């Protein structure tokens, strides 16, 4: 994966210049106005209410492309060259103040080629931070700061907390991407401000944070506040992030979204991760490591109270699923497997990757949690996307308000009180020692926690299995003492004439009462000519 010093983005970023078309009447404190174009002054009044008004009016104007040209010395850089750029510690924001936070800025270059405007905010006054090459150390790169334009701008920013001034707790860099860490201080999956038209038969649109306002934290406060303006051909937005580091870093997010035009698929609170190889999916299992992933499952807490665990996969073709819900209580991409032995990677430490849990504030109405799984042969490619998609059509002129909490870290703040899935294994079906006469797929799901450790030896635990097609056989549910839980096991015999995906649901019950969260899975049977029976020689 890319260095922890900067979050990765998987889009071709648009370039940004510093003006937008707005009418003079809505600029309020942004008083500089000429021919309908607004440029940010050096110091002006600022509030979140103003930012929402600014974004709302911007959405009524035609989108102005932000494309520009970087200096040649910053074009075509390698990742190693870009990593030579370091913001000087002595230039960090709030370094000389009694603050629990410091902020450093990212230099433009590589594929971070779109300047953003960054402002310091204190006591309701915003002042733009002017670029200066003296802020940066260019290391062994061939770039000479003295030859760069004085109005170059920045690519993004990152923050550190008083527990460790050398390591980031959050970073915003590229389009509307950002990342954060929990107590493990380990970057992993990313989030975005908004997703537009993901996994449709047309190019995805990547809205961009074009301006940031970094509010100076109060002395002794462990919360840092950031405001952001989002812009794209289809939508604008105003965002507020209250960032609180801890065992789980918490972000309180308020978003006001203003569509410029109808949007076919809007993604609210989008998450981006990577899954290449896991215990349940070894399609690309040629690597010496047994597991390679930033996240291993999508967790959902539905509006009706059901807890669902959906293991991720690396399909051979793009896979899209929508899980309908109303007023969801939470969803997220989690890294449940925390065992180093399962990864054996002492370079990137996948077992330390943070989970990210989204907790909606208020009612989000009807919609669906949507999951996109993209084939990948490369662990540096983020191939997993999840977000909330509202059911109501998105039309221009609307104001869409969303508030939610984001929790970054090892364990989400809220989990199912029932037993949870800890492992999912798959393989060839059938009975050991007996000749296989037809193809089947074996599924093994381990559950632990909840009330399982308290069950008596005579408890009649049953696996409740449902499938959209195919036949279930050789099913069982039995104690698994190694995890102080239970193991559900069954085979699926797919239809002979179909390679359509099969949707599976499993949970454990006793006396008709659920004991576990719901395990949900989608499996695509192979074509008939690839359904090998793998019978041993003496069983041929």
From Swiss-Prot:
Presence of keyword GTP-binding: no
Cellular localisation: Periplasm
Gene Ontology cellular-component annotations: outer membrane-bounded periplasmic space
The entry's keywords: Periplasm, Signal
Annotated transmembrane regions: none
A GO BP entry: beta-glucan biosynthetic process
Superkingdom in the source lineage: Bacteria
Pathway given in the UniProt record: Glycan metabolism; osmoregulated periplasmic glucan (OPG) biosynthesis
Keyword Signal: yes
Major place of residence: periplasm
Gene Ontology MF, one: catalytic activity
Signal peptide: 1-34
Positions in coiled-coil regions: none
PANTHER family associated with the record: GLUCANS BIOSYNTHESIS PROTEIN, GLUCANS BIOSYNTHESIS PROTEIN D
Family that this chain belongs to: Belongs to the OpgD/OpgG family.
Stated role: Probably involved in the control of the structural glucose backbone of osmoregulated periplasmic glucans (OPGs).
Family annotation (HAMAP family): MdoD_OpgD (MF_01068)
Name under which the protein is recorded: Probable glucans biosynthesis protein D
Origin species: Shewanella oneidensis (strain ATCC 700550 / JCM 31522 / CIP 106686 / LMG 19005 / NCIMB 14063 / MR-1)
């Amino acid at each position: 994966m890319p260095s922890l010093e900067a979050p990765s983005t998987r889009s071709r970023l648009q370039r940004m210049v510093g003006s937008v078309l707005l009418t003079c009447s809505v600029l309020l404190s942004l008083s500089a106005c000429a021919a309908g174009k607004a440029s940010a002054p050096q110091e002006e009044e600022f509030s979140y209410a103003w930012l929402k008004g600014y974004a709302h009016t911007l959405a009524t104007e035609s989108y102005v492309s932000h494309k520009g040209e970087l200096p040649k010395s910053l074009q075509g850089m390698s990742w190693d060259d870009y990593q030579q750029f370091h913001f000087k510690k002595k230039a960090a924001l709030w370094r000389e103040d009694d603050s629990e936070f410091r902020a450093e800025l990212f230099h433009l270059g590589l594929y971070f080629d779109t300047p953003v405007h960054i402002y310091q905010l204190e006591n309701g006054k915003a002042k733009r931070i002017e670029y200066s090459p003296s802020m940066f150390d260019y290391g062994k790169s061939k770039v000479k700061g003295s030859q760069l334009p004085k109005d170059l701008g920045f690519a993004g920013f990152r923050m550190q907390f008083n527990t460790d001034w050398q390591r980031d707790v959050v970073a915003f860099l590229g389009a509307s991407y950002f990342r954060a860490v929990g107590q493990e201080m380990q970057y992993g999956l990313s989030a975005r401000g908004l997703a537009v038209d993901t996994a449709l038969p047309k190019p995805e649109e990547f809205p961009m944070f074009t301006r940031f306002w970094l509010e100076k934290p109060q002395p002794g406060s462990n919360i840092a506040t950031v405001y952001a303006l989002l812009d794209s051909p289809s939508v604008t937005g105003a965002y507020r992030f209250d960032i609180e580091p801890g065992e789980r870093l918490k972000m309180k997010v308020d978003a006001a979204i203003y569509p410029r035009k109808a949007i076919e698929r809007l993604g609210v609170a989008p998450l981006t991760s990577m899954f290449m190889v896991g215990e349940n999916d070894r399609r690309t299992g040629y690597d010496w490591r047994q597991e390679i992933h930033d996240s291993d499952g999508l967790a959902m807490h539905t509006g009706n109270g059901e807890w669902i665990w959906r293991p991720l996969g690396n399909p051979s073709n793009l896979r899209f699923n929508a899980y309908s819900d109303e007023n969801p209580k939470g969803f997220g991409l989690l890294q449940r497997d925390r065992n180093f032995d399962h990864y054996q990677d002492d370079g990137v430490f996948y077992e330390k990757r943070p989970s990210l849990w989204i907790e909606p504030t208020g009612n989000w109405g009807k919609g669906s949690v949507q999951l996109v799984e993209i084939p990948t042969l490369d662990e540096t490619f983020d191939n997993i996307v999840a977000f909330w998609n509202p059911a109501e059509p998105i039309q221009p002129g609307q104001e869409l308000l969303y508030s939610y909490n984001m929790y970054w870290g090892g364990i989400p703040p809220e989990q199912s009180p029932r037993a949870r899935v800890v492992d999912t294994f798959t393989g060839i079906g059938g009975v050991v020692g007996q000749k296989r006469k037809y193809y089947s797929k074996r599924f093994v799901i381990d559950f632990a926690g909840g009330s399982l450790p308290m069950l008596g030896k005579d408890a009649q635990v049953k696996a409740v299995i449902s499938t959209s097609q195919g036949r279930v056989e050789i099913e069982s549910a039995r104690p698994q003492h190694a995890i102080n839980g239970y193991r559900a096991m069954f085979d699926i015999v797919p239809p002979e004439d179909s390679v359509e995906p099969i949707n599976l649901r499993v949970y454990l019950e006793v006396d008709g009462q659920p004991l576990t969260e719901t395990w949900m899975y989608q499996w695509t049977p192979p074509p008939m000519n690839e359904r090998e029976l793998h019978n041993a020689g003496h069983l041929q």
